[in-house]
A protein has these predicted regions:
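Active-site neighborhoods and metal-handling regions in enzymes and metal-associated proteins
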Residues: 1-210
Length: 210
C-alpha cells in the first residue's frame, strides 16, 4: 500500500534525509586507497549517532552494518569488513540511511579512490546524470514508468545496461515502502504519481547489458 505523506511528515523526513546525506558526504570523503570499508562504515555510524539519529540499515533484515559498501563490479549490499581494503582506482558505492522522529532517509553515491580509469569515471557520471533525469520525470500526475524510462533511456543511449533485479522504493516510517521504483519502464504506464508520495530513485548501471 502506498502511503501519502502530509506536509508536516515531509518536513520531518527532510531532517532524516539531511542527516543521511551529510553522513554519506563524510563517509565519501574517507574513500582513499588503504582505508578499509569497516573504517568508512564506522565514520558513517558515528556521524549519524552524533546528530541524534539512528542508522536505519543496521540490523535491518539482519544486515550487520550502518552502510552497504560495494566496490567496482559489486552492485549493492556489500558488507563492510576490516579485511576489505580500498585500492587505487576503485570505485566505491556507499548506501546508507538515518532515522529520526520516526522517519527515514536513504542516500547513496559512488566515490572514486584516487585516480580512476576514464571508463569508470564515465560510468559514474552517466549514473549520476541518470538520477537527475529520473528526478525530472517524477512529477505529480505522471506515471512511475516515466521515471524508469527516463533513467533507462539515458543510460542505454550511452551504451550501458540498467540493473533490473533491484529497484528503488517508497520511503517513510519504513525504510522500504511501496511502490517499487524500477530503473526501466514505459512512459505513461505504471502507478500514478501523486502529491505526498516520497520515493527513492536508485539508478544501478552496468557496463554493457545487465
Amino acid at each position: 500500500m502506498i502511503v501519502l505523506k502530509t506536509a508536516k511528515e515531509i518536513e520531518l523526513m527532510k531532517e532524516a534525509c539531511r542527516i543521511s546525506a551529510e553522513a554519506l558526504k563524510v563517509a565519501g570523503e574517507a574513500v582513499k586507497p588503504g582505508v578499509t570499508t569497516w573504517e568508512i562504515d564506522h565514520i558513517a555510524y558515528e556521524y549519524i549517532k552524533k546528530h541524534g539519529a539512528e542508522p536505519n540499515f543496521l540490523h535491518l533484515y539482519g544486515f550487520p552494518a550502518t552502510a552497504c559498501i560495494s566496490i567496482n563490479d559489486e552492485i549493492i549490499h556489500g558488507i563492510p569488513s576490516k579485511k576489505r581494503v580500498i585500492r587505487e582506482g576503485d570505485i566505491v558505492s556507499i548506501d546508507l540511511g538515518a532515522k529520526i522522529h520516526g522517519y527515514n532517509g536513504d542516500n547513496a553515491a559512488t566515490f572514486a579512490a584516487g585516480k580512476v580509469s576514464d571508463e569508470a569515471k564515465r560510468l559514474c557520471d552517466t549514473t549520476k546524470e541518470s538520477l537527475y533525469k529520473g528526478i525530472e520525470a517524477a512529477v505529480a500526475g505522471g506515471r512511475l514508468g516515466d521515471v524508469g524510462h527516463a533513467v533507462q533511456s539515458y543510460c542505454e543511449d550511452r551504451g550501458y545496461g540498467v540493473v533490473r533485479e533491484y529497484t528503488g522504493h517508497g520511503v517513510g516510517t519504513k525504510l522500504h515502502e511501496d511502490p517499487s521504483v524500477p530503473n526501466f519502464g514505459t512512459p505513461g504506464r505504471g502507478v500514478r504519481l501523486l502529491p505526498g508520495m516520497v520515493i527513492a530513485i536508485e539508478p544501478m548501471i552496468n557496463e554493457g547489458t545487465a
